[in-house]
Amino acid sequence: MKEGWEQLDEQQLAQGYFFDRQKECWVCLDCLKEFDRQEIFAFDGKFYTAQKAVQLHQKKEHPDRLHKILEEEKKLLSLTEKQEQLLERFAAGMTDAQIAKEFGVSASTVRHQRFVFRERAKSAKLYLAVWQMVQQQ
């Protein structure tokens, strides 16, 4: 990811774009392309607002966003290779049974790992809240 992503919230990081209030434009996090709020953008013969245009741009130009983040932020994420692969399968919409068959494990093992990811996400959310409280002191 480009520099400065630390100031963005988790929704902005996940969707891959944010609104720059100073420049009055939507910005793609991956390539920093700007979509001026006052402009109308053409995609595939249709016209879109800047926000919709940056969404379409993100899907078309950066469809591998999850994989890219998993690769580039290995140190921060602290995930094993198998965990990264599981997350990519979850994102692709594969069922627990399909994933289990591919990995040669039981579906309950996959369900347990999904549970572990949810617990880790809850922990991260609470950690962020605590850190914000500490910084406000």
Language model features: what each stretch is:
Residues L77-Q83:
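Short helix-coil-helix linker/hinge
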Residues M1-L66:
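DNA-contacting interfaces and partner/effector-binding or oligomerization modules
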